[in-house]
């Protein structure tokens, strides 16, 4: 039988349960680095951070800070009740490929217009992602 243990957060620690719904967008100047197959495929200090109840923060990277030559359109799409329709990318570096590993909102709903064409990745599908020098565990 699994025991349920409630973890108390530290005063300076964020909790996904404190994040808002609908989601909030914040500018982030943290150094974001995304590495796939040993290659830095995205790096910025101009990300947008989206916070939503029960979800880890998502960092959206400006397209000009992404090596888009490593990204190709994927047939997958999803719909967020707040942000609208998301399109997906497959990432390929050398002989290594990850399908549906990144996404973006081509035409997000009005409150989220600042996210248009910014790219987010699934950290678990990359070699490593860093946020402010700290390895992402999401």
Language-model segment annotations:
Residues 1-138:
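Terminal leader/tail segments of proteins
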């Amino acid at each position: 039988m699994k025991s349920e243990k409630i973890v108390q957060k530290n005063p300076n620690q964020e909790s996904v349960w404190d994040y808002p719904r609908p989601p909030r967008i914040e500018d982030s100047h943290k150094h974001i680095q995304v590495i796939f197959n040993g290659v830095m495929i995205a790096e910025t200090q101009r990300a947008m951070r989206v916070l939503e109840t029960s979800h880890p923060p998502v960092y959206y990277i400006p397209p000009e800070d992404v090596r888009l030559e490593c990204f190709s359109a994927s047939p997958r799409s999803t719909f967020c009740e707040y942000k609208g329709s998301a399109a997906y990318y497959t990432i390929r570096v050398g002989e290594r490929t990850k399908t549906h590993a990144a996404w973006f909102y081509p035409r997000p709903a009005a409150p989220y217009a600042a996210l248009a064409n910014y790219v987010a990745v699934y950290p678990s599908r990359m070699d490593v992602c860093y946020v402010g020098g700290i390895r992402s565990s999401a």
